[in-house]
Amino acid sequence: MQVATTGLVLRQVKVGEADRILTILTPDLGVVSASARGSLRMKSALFSATGLFCYSEFTLTSGRSHYFVDAAQVKKVFHGISASIEGMALASYMAEIAAELSPAPPEADAQLRLLLNCLYMISERHYPCAQLKAIYELRALTLAGYI
């Protein structure tokens, strides 16, 4: 069964010579694991769309235990995040929190929007990282129902 959805790549793990396993936060499926075959090859159509912190349009096929990425189209890449170590560390921390909270589909949309807004703020350096960290933690825990 094929599913078309948007999503943010939270985590990527290299598997084999040219494959990656991605953890993707989607608004309608929640947090999913997907295998992107050949995505590490420079000439692959999946190369740029499956990068870390890439917001993309995915076409996924469901497998037994996880999904497979059939196609992906980049919607937004947060290039400014990698400009500083502090920004990269904060973005990784936020992605880890989002993956651990594993929101169900109704709440996943709000978590995704919050994370995308925070990644944009880190990328454009609108606020100090310490302030963004506090804002994200408070809002993410509130959306998850802990506060």
Ranges and model annotations:
Residues M1-I147:
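Non-catalytic alpha-helical scaffolds and adjoining flexible linkers that form interface surfaces
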